[in-house]
Amino acid sequence: ATKSTRPEGASTWWAQGGIAVARQNPEPFQRDIETASSDTSDPAAVEVLTQHADAAVRDVLIDTLNVDFDAGGDGAPYDYGREAAHSADRILHVDASTGKHIHEPFLAYLAEHPKVQIADGTAAVGLLAEEGRVRGARLASNGTIAPVYAGATVLATGGIGALYGHSTNPAGATGDGIAMAARAGADTADMEFVQFHPTVCIADGDPFLISEAVRGEGAVLRDAQGERFMPPVHADAELAPRDVVARAVERAHERTGQVVLDVSSFDFETTFPDLQALCESHGVDPSTGIPVVPAEHFLCGGIEVDTRGRSSLEGLYAVGECARTGVHGANRLASTSLLEGLVWGLRAGAAAPGHEQPAARSEEAVQTGDPPAPDTLQSAYDRIQAIMDEHVGLRRTPEGLARAQDALRTLAAEVEPHAAPDAPPVGHELQSACTVALLVAEAAAQNEVSVGCHYVTDPGDAGDPVAA
């Protein structure tokens, strides 16, 4: 079941850079993941990811879906790229639109599968849970909300980009799965670790990602005076971990008024034709520098799961960005999100059939009521985004986080009537956004240690952005 009716509604579609593999050498890959996380990732989870990476990509993406990854030079079958904080070339890619090229054949495969039914335009608005057990979900479609019973329920609902003013996520990324799981009593973890991508172009007000692969190819960041600012900040300069680069970009933007990505050191149009076309469609000429700012990109936390995707509730699984597997810790290494979703998806898929199908109850379907007025919805989202941008963004203060919690609790109370049992999906979606925003703010307030994506500072502090 997916609330979207378009492939672009899935986060996978939007992934650009690529998918990392171990190349038969998982130990250095594991070290890179742990280093990028400031040694906050779960070593057992990282080991699962790196040990299963090659087989998962080969068996599913290459042998089953026939994803045509870019070839290397001199007849090499693959062009392995390198991105920030990777110590080796290990990233498979298709131009700079890898997610789309994975997602399209995946949907085609599912469409032909005799045991898969895709219900699009169908939103999950709540879980059927009691006594620590999930028995299915309540699904809304065509003006009706009805229970669907299942031995296992797998959440793969993506991220939380809609909670921020600028994001690289699809518009529907309101954290629905995390909110439903939390309301049902599932454990969440690491919710304060919201990763901001350092290079997002919003030239015409419509954000679009400039892949990390561009910096891996040699692009550099310059301020409004044309000066590079990353070399003094970190030894790896533009290829430092994302949290470091994002804060440095924000500082440089505040200091000089603009930051551009200079791609003049290589043939950008030939190397990244999809990105060239995307820039041109937004009125940006890459040859003169691509204006960039940080924007919300990825939630490293989520529904706490084990190495099989099992949550704290019996019968409930989570995979992908809505899950907190422990792989990322405080900061995600580039090009590991597609891999995490693939590996945990396979493992959850193998474990989920082991649950007994629950008996259906006599609960009846209900007709949905009228949705909130469009201006009511827009006003609520505007308030959520303003709160999160100001107080729960790249740099946070204890006072700001306290104000954010107060404001979000007030808003949640106002929104609650719009999420009644017979409310249409947009009301439940808004409630989910409020729920998850508050989870992020509360987790951030409880963690006084600056690490990775979570950077806490005193008001007015202008210290070194890599102090965390």
Residue positions per predicted region:
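Conserved redox-cofactor binding core of oxidoreductases
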Residues: D63-T144, A156, H197-I202, L221
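Rossmann-like flavin
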Residues: A36-D79
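Core beta-strand elements of the Rossmann-like FAD/NAD(P) dinucleotide-binding domain
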Residues: G143-A152, S311-G315
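Conserved N-terminal glycine-rich FAD pyrophosphate-binding loop of Rossmann-like flavoproteins
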Residues: S4-E34, S38, F208-S211
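An anion/pyrophosphate-binding glycine-rich loop and adjacent beta-alpha core
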Residues: M180, A186-T288, A351
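Short beta-strand to alpha-helix junction loop
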Residues: A44-D54, D89-A108, A119, S167-G175, ...
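Glycine- and aromatic-enriched mobile tails/lids
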Residues: P7, W14-Q16, D59, D68-G81, ...
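Glycine-rich loop(s) and the adjacent beta-strand/alpha-helix scaffold that form part
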Residues: A152-F208, L338, L342-W344
